[in-house]
Structure formats: structure tokens, C-alpha cells
Amino acid sequence: MVYSYSEKKRIRKDFGKRPQVLDIPYLLSIQLDSFKKFTDQDPTGERGFEAAFRSVFPIKSFSGYSELQYVSYKLGEPVFDVKECQIRGVTYSAPLRVKLRMVLFDREAAAGTVKDIKEQEVYMGDIPLMTDNGTFVINGTERVIVSQLHRSPGVFFDHDRGKTHSSGKVLYNARIIPYRGSWLDFEFDPKDALFVRIDRRRKLPATIMLRALEYSTQDILDLFFERIQFKIKKDSLVMALVPDRLRGETASYDIKAADGSVLVEAGRRITARHIKQLEQSNTTELEVPVDYIVGKYAAQDYIDEDTGEVLVSANNEISLEDLAKLSIAGIKEIDTLFINDLDHGAYISDTLRIDSTTNRLEALVEIYRMMRPGEPPTKDAAEALFQNLFFSEERYDLSKVGRMKFNRRLEIAEDEGNGVLSKDDIVCVMKKIIEIRNGYDEVDDIDHLGNRRIRSVGEMAENQFRVGLVRVERAVRERLSLGDLNELMPQDLINAKPISAAVKEFFGSSQLSQFMDQNNPLSEVTHKRRISALGPGGLTRERAGFEVRDVHPTHYGRLCPIETPEGPNIGLINSLASFARTNSYGFLETPYRKVVEGVITDEVEYLSAIEEGRYVIAQANIEVDSTGRMVEEQIACRHKGESTFMRAADIQYMDVSPQQIISVAASLIPFLEHDDANRALMGANMQRQAVPTLRADKPLVGTGIERTLAVDSGVVVVAKRGGVVDYVDASRIVVKVNEDELRPGEAGIDIYNLTKYTRSNQNTCINQRPCCFVGEPVVRGDVLADGPSTDLGELALGQNMRIAFMPWNGYNFEDSILISERVAQEDRFTTIHIQELSCIARDTKLGSEEITADIPNVGESALSKLDESGIVYIGAEVKGGDILVGKVTPKGETQLTPEEKLLRAIFGEKASDVKDSSLRVPNSVKGTIIDVQVFTRDGVEKDKRALEIEEMHVAQARKDLGEEFKILEEGVLSRARNLLLSAGYSEAKLAELPRKDVLIQVIDDEAKQTELEQLAEQHEELKADFDKKFEIKRRKITQGDDLAPGVLKIVKVYLAVKRTIQPGDKMAGRHGNKGVISKICPVEDMPYDEEGNPVDIVLNPLGVPSRMNIGQVLEVHMGAAAKGIGNKITAMLEEQREIAELRGYIKQVYELGDDVLQRVDIDSFSDDEVVRLATHLKGGIPIATPAFDGAKEKEIKQMLALAGLPESGQLTLCDGRTGNEFERKVTVGYMYMLKLNHLVDDKMHARSTGSYSLVTQQPLGGKAQFGGQRFGEMEVWALEAYGAAYTLQEMLTVKSDDVNGRTQMYKNIVDGNHQMQPGMPESFNVLLKEIRSLGINIELDQE
């Protein structure tokens, strides 16, 4: 493998044995691609804005003399960029402008004569845009729209599993689900009649539906039944024989062949053997007794031609009297319906008998009554309603997906078709459900991923946009029909409010629009790849059963079987598997390698769950020889959702990678194959809660996916083009681009600005720091700067800690963790949290609030950290209760005497009219102010601090743009100098010229002169561009802010809190091994090895066997080996050994392992590169052990041996307190530990007095309300059991809801008098009132 300069800094030793045929696709593509499809112009009009507009326009007036047509649309440019939107708290969006054409027709002239056409561009609201990282900025906060897994449109056949009826009979049902429109259900009842429901309303006999579709009784019988023909003889009947129809019946008469021989005797059951004999004897007719026809049903009406009397009606049971009538009328042949109990049920025939309607009109009226109960039906209304239900394109749409699924299920050849239903469609569904009831077909599996599809952002946004457009359509149609249209323009007809409201509602408050989880890069990526079955049009937690939540065979390679939340949402919220993607229909696909005649090719095909069932698919870990031919005879594979063994020649596809079945979070767990699934689930979920530490530390034992994840998450800065690093500081990196990657006529400089100390959604700190140096070559895709939780471009969520598995004085009882003081001293788990506190000055009824340092009744010391505008300084260290922003609010006017009014008028306002409503630091928070933002309403005068901040921002913008201009200008000038040098100018002559005069020289060579002129032109463009950019920036900074109504000013203060690790904080490994820190132990008391090195963390060995997450033990051994190798390399560097020796040792390390694919050609590295690599390996050699394809036990032992450690991975430890050796050897090594965002500082709080609940007068609960501890029913029992009467009394009275008692108690304590007088608890009064509300008068007699 070829490594770039920056990749050579630190190479991860990979133990993977399988070749990667396919790289993991871009992780955020599900979000970005979906939204791109929505916003991109689509000439076909099948999706996005185009589809929405075409589905609603043209809008015709009721009279038909005017219409509004859609021409085209255009998305404008956003006013503010993403960062500005986040600071200002506005939505990152672009205006949508639509070109509309209003056409007026001449009323007098012939139809369709155009009188007037007006075209105009109309504003249709702002559409939120997606950022490059797949998020939306809504009102200044980053949000993610989670994709939804919902039931695909189409037709589904199912049964009730025998739960509906007490007999346990299985009732079948069919449901046609459109993309939008009414649902149509067909279902059997316990008596086997078929019913229809529309939109889950009252059921009607299904034949009503057929009658409404203009089928007569006769048509219905012909559609669903075969006929049996009988010829009427004198004493008997002759039946036309179809032998197969007799199967399973008991012969009630002797069945004879054509030659008269008896084939089946009366009373015998007719079997397949008899039928075969009948077929062979070529018997076409069979003589049967007259009573054989009794009980069968007529297939048509039989009419006496002379009288016109109906002798036997279609679908009526035939009796002997009927037969006699037919004979008398001279009818020689009669057809009956072929019905049997085995596989040709009388379902439709029975249903027709329940059906009270006889013609189409009656059927339509019946449907109208069911849909609109209580309204008198008319013929037109009934017809219009039925037509609109399933046959109108405006009201009903199966969609492309629905039509495809519908046609495939009903075995119709083509996938394309109409979006509305046809008569044939409905009949086909009824035929299919009868087939299923007769046992010819199976019901569908609702949880199969071929029946559930993904709805992503773009599609959901389009649907909301269409909802808004439909609301507009109604208003436009009314306006088109009113008044004089000659004066109006399209703009006057359209009101964009409903569209904006629909879109805003979706992005702001939809269940699937979620506040982005921004704890660390992994949690961001996982959130964007989440697939939820909840949400509008989806399931609800309460109704979702076990089957929906369970892992389904079709999840393989599509949804992760491991990563899902614990709790009520388990199985309803899933994560996309690493390689999965959605196809054009919205079904999940996963890639497979094609296998031809037992040989694996490199051709990769994506298959959806529907297609996958047809093929035989082998796993990725099968043995192959050097040519790619499968070695084993019988190969483990999957076919139709079952695991089985097949011959190599039968295999058609093979997995692309062992990691393909799991999600990104699960594939970050090393040795995942040795962990129990439940613990792996916790491990995957807890990595998302890891807080970025102060200094990120790459995992020694990783899986090789860390780099992909860090780059795709967007938190690191990646080189857009190759080149050489020209300039680096903490906030910007400048790269001089390679000549061969330049676009013609550009300066060839790329500038990357870094994000510094900003707040994430979870209050963690986002900060980028450069990881490259000036002069380093970079190629496209190299990481230039690390973000939060990344180290040299690799994801680094925690720290590598030296751990020992042993009990230690009970301090690691029940998963507690004992850590060394050194961990805290070295700031290994110190994190920075940034809080945003805002102070809003409003315009109140009594006057406006004011932000000022002049606050009543506050001492000088409290104002010491405020400037003259009343706003805290940047850099001030503040603690709970300190004032951050001074604010005063006008008090209600007290009634003044005339004298006071006079004094007030003479001496002006007194400070007594205002009360202090300043912004203070919340209790238990201590930190440093790192930034202040002031937003002032347009038209309100800015205070001194706001102007200072504005000046600072303008100066910063000028500096940034100036430096950018300088760098770009230098690029142009250096190219001009090189041109002049090549044209014969000497270095000395160039040195004499003023800097910019190189552009105005004259050269003899015409081509070079043209090039020089181009450069001069480019320089002018740069200058103009700089002025324009600066002016835009300055205008944005100085303009007033658009604040909410009634708000005059907002001050936002950002407070950075540094949190060191302490007892009570939650920590975890990556294998679901979580615990709480019980004690921070002095270094000298920690167990240490024979060389005197103490361990950092002591874990309880009892946490491993019962949890079955052995992966952690293997990780510890591998970590010990990795660190040991690092120590050896450190020793070599310190002893300044020969580079050849160093190179040899490193080579030995990278070549270790059986069949390991990775080949690192250390021999091709220069000496400098070897030393630089060795320097980066000093802390330990990073290792990749991919999931299901990782290092084996033997390889771990080889690594330990290479590091000079015992192969058992166990050491003799000594007790730090006594110096004695422990009796047994202890497993010691390195584990990657995470600090989770469950910090004790955020949970602990204390209260003496505070706020009380209004009704019960009991203290509130929870830290947010500054509440108390609940002393509940069971705690009362405990005190009663102890007989602690006085303690119990004070708990239930003065400490809780005895209002007078508690105030008195407070006074007594202040006075030093420690006595209490308990009174009546308020909750007792509440109880009395409750009883009275039931109409029982209850009074308390106090004697």
C-alpha cells in the first residue's frame, strides 16, 4: 500500500485477513443525496420541487375562464452563512422564487381563446438548506432529520394469527396502502364471507365494491368461479367431467369409466390414483344421480322463454323442484358453480347472499352512507365520492414504489403503471386473497425489508412542501373566481404564509426533526444514519409488538443487529449498516461480490431485500485459494433468509466484508466477535456518550475504521487539493496548491479557517487544532487539522489507561472503578464544557427593561466584573450567584400622593421604580467567560459594549480578508516574477522593482506578455473581490438584528467550565463495561509491577465472566503488547541506536501475523521518515483488529513476545501500601477508557429552602427546579418500623408542607432556638378538599 507523507506519520498495524474490495461509502450520503434530489432541478418532474409544483399547478378557477400555470422555480442564495446563522440564532435558508403565468380566457369568444397572459416571479417562502455535514440550522441550533422506516405503499396480504375470533380460526385480510389517499381493506369474517373497508371504517360486503365498479351478479360469478355443466336426462344427470375436481371427495355413487367398468365404488374417498385412472380412461362425461345437483348453486339465471319467469336465479341453491321446473320449461342443460371445501371455497357466493344491493346505484349509496353517515345521499354526490376515493389523481396516488410493489405481488409483468387503481386492480386483489384462503399462496411477512422502505429528508420535506402548496391552491382558486382579474398579477393571488408555515413546522417541530446529538463526532454521524420506525405515518411505542422490534434475516447488511437503544424504543430505532444505501425506490440495499462457477470476482452488485431472496449468498470469511476459487466442498451460505450449506458451484454472491452487517458504532469495538450481543449493544451506545477530552489520545487497539469516521464526520479539516503547507497558526492553514491541480487563471492558494472554542449542542467544546507543519507536502484527502475527539485524523473518544483486573479493598465492588491520582493530575480525563447564558431586555407594559451597571441594592463588589454597560468582561472568572449582565425592570406603579408626584416631577425618576432582574451564574457553576455577544434591535441605540464588539468584529474581518488577499496576491505576484525570470529578467533587476510593478512590465514574447496581462487582470479582480467581500461582511456586522417581537436587546454570555475527573463520574470501556469512580487513590497506594510502574485503574475481575464480554480481556492483552513495543522503540531512540536496527524492529512488528493482508514497505521509507514514524510510535504501536476479522490468540501471544512481555499477559504486582507481592499474578495491560457525559457535577445538588408546589405546598423535585428529595410512602414505613416518631414528624411537617411550621422553624434556627412547633400539613387540607369534591362533607374537629 502507498502511504502519503502525512499517513506515514503513524501507521496502524492491521490484523485484517480479508481484502477490502469496496471502501466504506461516504457515511453521510443518505442525508446529503436525499436533500440534493429535493433541491436539484429535475427536468423529468418526478421528484423535488418540480414534482410538487406539477402536481398542484395549473390551478383553474371554478368557472374555467382563468388559470394559474407554473413555469419554473429558482432557489436564491442564503443571506447569512452557517456560522453567522448559529451566532445570530436564525435559520440557514434560501428564498424560493417561482415564475408563474396567469392566463385569462375570453368569455365571449370560442372556448380556449386566450384573452391575456401575465407572467411574474413570486416569492414562496424560505426553504431551510442542508449544511455540508448533513444538518440543518434552525433558529441557530443544529438539527438532524432522522430517516423513517415505514410500510411501503402497495398491497399486503396478512392474517390475524387466530386472535380475533374465539374459535381461533385464522382470518385472512388484504390491504392496499397508497402513498397518499384512502386505504382499502378486504377481510374474511369467521363465516368466510368477504368484506371491504375503506379507511378502516364500518365494513361492507365486498361484492358492494364490485357492483359499484359496474359488475352484475352474473359478471361477479363468472370472475370468481369455474362452472360444472350438467345435461338433464329423464332419471339422471350427465356431468361434464374434469377429473381433478373430484379430488378429496367421497363418492356417493359408483364412478364408471367410459367402458362401463367401476373405477371408484360408492362410499370410497377419491384419491390421486383414481384421478390418474380416470384421466387415462379418457372419460369426459359421468352419469350421476339426480340428487347429486341438490345443494349446488346455479351459475346464471334460467328463464322460461314463454312466460319470462325466472325459474332459477344465479347463485341460488338448486332443489329437486327447481330441476322439475327446468325440465318442464324444456331447458336441457344447467351450469352450477364449482365449489368444494378443500380448495374452491364458496366465499364470493356467500358474500353475494349477504349483499342487500342489486345494482350500481344502490352500491354507491351504501358506500356513501358508510363514508358520510347522516348526510342524505344523491346520485351525483355518491358517484363523485366513489370516483374521488381511488380513481382521482388528485386524491389518490400509489406512487412509483407502490405500483411496482403492487404489480410484483399480483404477478403483473411490468413494474410501471398508473398511480390510481383500476377495476382490474381491485378484482386482482380479491382473486389473490381468495387464492390465499384456498391455500394456493402465502401471506406476506410485514417485517421483511422488502415491505418496509426508507423515507429520507428530501422526500419528507417534499411532502410537507406539497401540503403547503395544496393549502395555497384552495385560496388561489377562490381568488381566481372573485373580482376583476384584469388588474391582478400572480403575486396578488399567492400568499406564501401557508407554505412557510408547513415547512417551518416540519423542520422545527416534527417528531423526526431532532436536536443533533453533538457529544462527539461518532454521535453526530450515528444520529444522521439513524433509521426510526416512529414518527408521523409510522408506529407508536405502545402499539409496536415484539415482531416489529426483532432482528429479521433481511436486516443482514442493511440495518445493524447490535446498535439500538435500550428501553421502550428498543428495535424501533435502528442504525444503518456500514455499507448499506437506499435505492431509487427507497429500499435498503447492500453490496455483494459476484461469484461465477465457484470463482469470486471483484465485481460488486447492490441487492435489495426483495432481490436477495432469489440468490445463494456466501459469507465473507470463506476460504479461497490464490486464484479466488473456493476451497471447501460444502460452503455455509444464506438462501431465502435461511442459513444452509451448499456446493461451491451453486454460490452466486458473497459478502464484501465481515463488517458489512454492523453499523459504524459497532464496528469501532475491537474483538467484537468475543463479546455478548447485549454488552456490545451497550458498548456501541456508550461510545456516543463519550465527552471529548482535553488532549485526544488515539486508541492503541482500534479497528481501522477510526480514520474514515473522523474524516466523514466533518469535524476535521481535510485538504481539498494537494500542495505544500505554506502557513500555519492556531486559526488558519494556508496550502499552496500543486501546479497540476490548478484551475486556469487562479491564484493557487487554499485557505482553511479553523473553528475555535465554540459550543456544541451538548455544551461540549468544539475546537480544531492544526496537525501539519509548514513545508509539509499534502495530498487531496489528507487531514490538516484535528477536531474534537480526533488525533492525527483518527477518531479518539477516550484515553489509553494502564489497568489491572483485581479486587482492591472493596473499592471496585459492583462495577465501581478505582483510579489513580496521577490520572487526574495529568488531566487525562479533563473536559471543557461551554455554557451559553442569555439575558433578554424586553419592552414591558410599564416601560422597557434596561441593561445597565446601575443596579439597585447591589454592592460594589458584586459589580466588580462588569464594565460600564453592565456586561461582564471576557476572561473574568465567575462562580455561582455572580452577576453576568446587569438588568433592571420597571416595577408596577404604586399609588403616589400629590406631594410625591410633585417631587418626582421636579427631581426626575427615582431608582425605587425598578427591580433587579440581572442575569446571574447558576448555582454550582464555576468557570471563565470566553465570549460575549450583544444583539440590538434595529432602531434601538447600541450601547458602548455593543459598539466595541462590532468594531472588533469589523477589524477581525478586515484582518482575515486582508491576510487572505495578501496571500492570494503573493501567489499572483510570485507567478508574475517567475514569468519575468523565464523571459530573461535577472534576479537583481526584479529585486529593484517595486513589489506590484512586476505586473506592468513589457515583454517581447507575445504569449508571455498575454499571460502577464492575464495575471495583472487577475490581480485587479482580487482587489475588487476583496473590497466587495469586506463591504458585505461590514454591512452584516453593523446592521441591526431581527429579534422577536417585544425584544430590544439580547446579551449572550459564553462560560467555559473545566471539569476534572472525580468520584461519581461514569466511565466505560468499549465492550459495555461501565462503572462509576468510587475513589481516587494516591499513586503510592496503587498496585505496581516489578519495575515500580503503578497501574492507573483497577477493575473488578468479577465484571467479566457473567457479562461474557471477553473482548475487553483480549483488548487489555493486545494493548499491553502495543505499549510494550512502543516502550522498546522509545528505548532505541533514547539510546540512539542505528537506524538500520530501528528499521528492522519496526519491519518485524508490521510483518507479524498469519495471512495478514497489510504490507508496509518500511524499506522504501527514508531514514527521516523511519525516525518520524518511530517518534509517533513511542506511546505504543496503534493496532487495527477489524470486527469478525481480527487478531487471533496466537497473534496476541506473538505480539507480547515481541514486546518482551510474558505470553500469559499477567504480571506479579505489589501492594502499594505494604510493598508485599500479591499472591497470584494479575492481568495488566492497556484498555481504552471513555468518560461519559453523566458527570456527578451535573447531578449533585443541595437545597435547604426553595420553591414549593402551588397546590400541595411540597418542595418541587429535580435539580432544574432546585427541588428537594422525595420522602415517599416506603420511606415513611421504614421510619415507622424503626419507631423514629420525632424524625418522622418533622419529615412530614416542617421539612415538607406545614407552611406556618416551616417558616417559624427557619426563624427559630436563625435565632438559635432549636425547637419546632409542627402544624397541619397542607396535603391533609388537599385531601379534605378532594373528598368534598366527591360530594362527601368532611370536617376536622380540632379540640
Curated annotation (Swiss-Prot):
GO-annotated biological processes:
DNA-templated transcription
Q: Which reaction does it catalyse?
A: RNA(n) + a ribonucleoside 5'-triphosphate = RNA(n+1) + diphosphate
Which Gene Ontology cellular component terms are annotated? DNA-directed RNA polymerase complex
Identify a single GO molecular function assigned to this protein.
Answer: DNA-directed RNA polymerase activity
Q: Tell me which family the UniProt entry assigns to this protein.
A: Belongs to the RNA polymerase beta chain family.
**How would you summarize the oligomeric state and partners of this protein?**
The RNAP catalytic core consists of 2 alpha, 1 beta, 1 beta' and 1 omega subunit. When a sigma factor is associated with the core the holoenzyme is formed, which can initiate transcription.
Free-text function comment from the UniProt entry: DNA-dependent RNA polymerase catalyzes the transcription of DNA into RNA using the four ribonucleoside triphosphates as substrates.
What is the protein's name according to its record?
Answer: DNA-directed RNA polymerase subunit beta
* Species this protein is from: Shewanella denitrificans (strain OS217 / ATCC BAA-1090 / DSM 15013)
Gene name for this UniProt entry: rpoB
